[in-house]
Amino acid sequence: VGFKAGVKDYKLTYYTPDYETKDTDILAAFRVTPQPGVPPEEAGAAVAAESSTGTWTTVWTDGLTSLDRYKGRCYHIEPVPGEESQFIAYVAYPLDLFEEGSVTNMFTSIVGNVFGFKALRALRLEDLRIPPAYTKTFWGPPHGIQVERDKLNKYGRPLLGCTIKPKLGLSAKNYGRAVYECLRGGLDFTKDDENVNSQPFMRWRDRFLFCAEAIFKAQAETGEIKGHYLNATAGTCEEMMKRAVFARELGVPIIMHDYLTGGFTANTSLAHYCRDNGLLLHIHRAMHAVIDRQKNHGMHFRVLAKALRMSGGDHIHAGTVVGKLEGERDITLGFVDLLRDDFVEKDRSRGIFFTQDWVSLAGVLPVASGGIHVWHMPALTEIFGDDSVLQFGGGTLGHPWGNAPGAVANRVALEACVQARNEGRDLAREGNEIIEEASKWSPELAAACAIWKKIKFEFEPVDTI
């Protein structure tokens, strides 16, 4: 019989406004900026086609399968308020398009090719709805929030961390000394910076050994369980696993991975190893702003956060709302809830386009890090709540008396804020008062308050692109 060759409009096949989404569909919300003259329906359908079964022309092998069963469908289009040339295209993908348990395959399909499409000026993936049928094919976080608290025996407050600075250039022994001083002063965790791997000035094995010594010494002296995020990120998966195995042999509680630069395949392998071997896994989001900072093109961080919860990690950096790195309060709390909670309702005011049911997938602790110090403690305690890690790098190591007093100042400030909150005080209104009261009996906190009182990072965002 032959077939009708030639180029055809995508919207004839892939724009289906009458489609009723299934419980098993993966749903995507794209912010689409089409080229002038391209109608919204055609642009939305093009996104659905190019990220599923479509190609630019009709091919005879289309007749050998059921396109209706496997194609993505653009089922709804809505304008973006305040933007003339933009709209949100909602696309539904049948579950059979995706390999089970593979974030790599999911992203290769949904965002792998379509972002370079000529008919679009810009394209941004704003949100994904992951159905329970797909969620259940992932292991998710190695342990989750409750198991982590049980391992650490720490309840009822946020956890405290510190990134060791300067991030590059210290010898392993001096690095270990800084770790010991911070943990001894009262922090729960210290952290390798994301770009500390295995450089000529400090090879990974030396760092692991000195940090392990620091952890066990601080534990013995304080009676608290301590940890240091040993960065296992490496140039090959085999080398990464070798570092994870060595960390486990040392008996440390937690390791770390840069999940975007390391890649989802490596991250999922590492998360599986951590679950099998009792290691917690801290995740750094290095490179995220390359993908998520532009509001018209790329991918929103809430999508990367969902992907991490599926791939596996017990902590992930999530912005601060109050520090030096960008993060709008409602939007940030939207993806913080997506990391921690089992069920999150659709709420467009917080950027959540779909109701997300994680069924029994464990939660991830959000990490607030970047330009924060003791005066931020009341706001951070109120915004992030107990299930979070508050991480002060310069805010610990920049203390005028040294690392250990810097750690003491942070711990005293945190305990004061938690106690005040538990007594029913309003942290938002009385925050400075609470810190000032605590500083009267903690000289370390008083010194920290004096040095950082005037520091603020409240710049207006300059990006309007």
UniProtKB/Swiss-Prot annotation:
This is Ribulose bisphosphate carboxylase large chain. It comes from Dillenia indica. Binds 1 Mg(2+) ion per subunit. The disulfide bond which can form in the large chain dimeric partners within the hexadecamer appears to be associated with oxidative stress and protein turnover. Its EC number is 4.1.1.39. The modification N6,N6,N6-trimethyllysine is found at residue 4. The keyword Transferase does not apply. GO terms for molecular function: magnesium ion binding; monooxygenase activity; ribulose-bisphosphate carboxylase activity. Mg(2+) binds at residues 191, 193-194. Heterohexadecamer of 8 large chains and 8 small chains; disulfide-linked. The disulfide link is formed within the large subunit homodimers. It holds the Pfam family RuBisCO_large. The active site is at residues 165, 284. The record marks 324 as: Transition state stabilizer.
